[in-house]
């Protein structure tokens, strides 16, 4: 949120905003498989707190660079190496984080745990953008100092976990690349996992839509940081509503229906937001987007984890993050589309691309349609 607004405000360039926000995705996509191997080989708890602490330091560093005006309109590129390193850290953190949840709660409670986790995290998604809008108004550096505090608090919470399970002990080959190859072959040969990963690639179209949000609020509607924060918070409200609903119905509805709901709600929200004539409709669209996102998060990650062997779980989750975090590459393409064609064309391309891949995969994958 903060970097997108800062870059757009300092440079006035949608393309530059998209480029800088796409950088973490490059690191995550290129390193996630190795993060998955580490999650399978070593204790996940240790990986989690160490990577989170490093991200805390980088957030603090970014805040200091903004405070002393070392980062400005002519040195905005300093954000590129920082974003690249943060992306590398998340590439190591994400597979371990997802796999660690299953270590603690087990497969039987994974759906409920995922719904509860999504509901808890979306409370922060509601509060953080609202607070972030105020912090951006007070000063760009405030946002990163606050992020550093939250990341450090998260580190302390991870360290305080008493009940933790070590990763399943598996035979370790001497060649990390062999482990990567075995993970790729395992995922490709499993029809359900393969279909879920193809579906996840639609995240790049979500990324194409992301630059539309600050441009719509700042340039189209002429609003400021606070309104930008509020509209992002409404995405969290929608996700919270969706998470609570999914927690209640739990396993009463087949996962394929939840997946269809996620596509329809999200892509309809994208269209409404892009063509909305006023701020109120933008808020409604963001709530709808949040509902779609919640349905996604309680469908695809859960199906992947519950249909993957224990010794391959970290690598499969890393593949999931490689595909879903193509949305950050979408930032770059979205920025280019915005500068060249505007908001309406951008959201149309994002919606058509997402629905086309999603519908085709569901139609031709029997294993996905029968998954539950």
Where are these regions (language model features)?
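Helix-loop boundary and gating motifs at the non-cytosolic
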Residues: 1-27, 185-233
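Transmembrane alpha-helix termini and helix-breaking/packing motifs in multi-pass membrane transporters
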Residues: 4-10, 63-71, 127-146, 219-220, ...
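Hydrophobic alpha-helical transmembrane segments
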Residues: 76-83, 87, 112-167, 233-237, ...
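C-terminal transmembrane bundle of multi-pass solute transporters/carriers
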Residues: 41, 47, 61, 181, ...
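Juxtamembrane intracellular "pre-TM" segments in multi-pass secondary transporters
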Residues: 163-197
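Substrate-agnostic recognition of the 12-TM MFS/MFS-like secondary transporter fold
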Residues: 1, 23-37, 43-56, 78-136, ...
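MFS-fold secondary transporters
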Residues: 8, 61-70, 86, 158, ...
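Helix-loop junctions at membrane interfaces in 12-TM secondary transporters
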Residues: 64-82, 274-285
């Amino acid at each position: 949120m903060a970097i997108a607004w800062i870059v757009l405000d300092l440079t006035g360039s949608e393309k530059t905003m998209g480029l800088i926000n796409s950088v973490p995705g490059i690191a995550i996509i290129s390193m996630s498989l190795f993060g998955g191997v580490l999650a399978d080989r070593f204790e996940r708890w240790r990986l989690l707190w160490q990577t989170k602490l490093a991200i805390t330091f980088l957030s603090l560093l970014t805040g200091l660079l903004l405070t002393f005006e070392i980062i400005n309109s002519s040195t905005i590129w300093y954000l590129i190496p920082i974003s690249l390193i943060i992306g590398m850290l998340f590439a190591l953190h994400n597979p371990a984080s997802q796999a660690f949840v299953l270590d603690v709660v087990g497969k039987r409670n994974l759906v409920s745990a995922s719904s509860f986790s999504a509901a808890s995290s979306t409370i922060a998604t509601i509060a953080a953008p609202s607070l972030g809008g105020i912090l951006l108004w007070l000063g760009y550096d405030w946002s990163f100092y606050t992020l550093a505090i939250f990341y450090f608090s998260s580190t302390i919470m991870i360290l305080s976990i008493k009940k933790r399970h070590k990763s399943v002990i598996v035979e370790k080959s001497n060649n990390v690349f062999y482990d990567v190859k075995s993970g790729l072959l395992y995922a490709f040969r499993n029809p359900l996992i393969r279909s879920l990963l193809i579906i996840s690639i639609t995240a790049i179209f979500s990324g194409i839509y992301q630059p539309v949000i600050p441009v719509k609020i700042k340039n189209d509607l002429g609003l400021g940081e606070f309104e930008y924060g509020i509209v992002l918070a409404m995405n969290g409200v929608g996700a919270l509503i969706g998470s609570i609903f999914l927690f209640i119905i739990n396993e009463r509805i087949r996962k394929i229906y939840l997946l269809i709901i996620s596509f329809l709600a999200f892509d309809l929200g994208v269209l409404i937001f892009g063509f909305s004539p006023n701020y109120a409709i933008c808020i409604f669209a963001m709530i709808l987007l949040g509902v779609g996102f919640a349905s996604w998060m309680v469908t695809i990650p859960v199906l992947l984890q519950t249909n993957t062997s224990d010794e391959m779980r970290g690598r499969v989750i890393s593949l999931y993050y490689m595909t879903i975090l193509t949305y950050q590459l979408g930032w770059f393409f979205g920025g280019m589309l915005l500068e060249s064609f505007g908001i309406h064309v951008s959201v149309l391309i994002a919606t058509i691309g997402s629905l086309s891949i999603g519908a085709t995969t569901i139609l031709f994958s029997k294993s996905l349609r029968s998954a539950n």
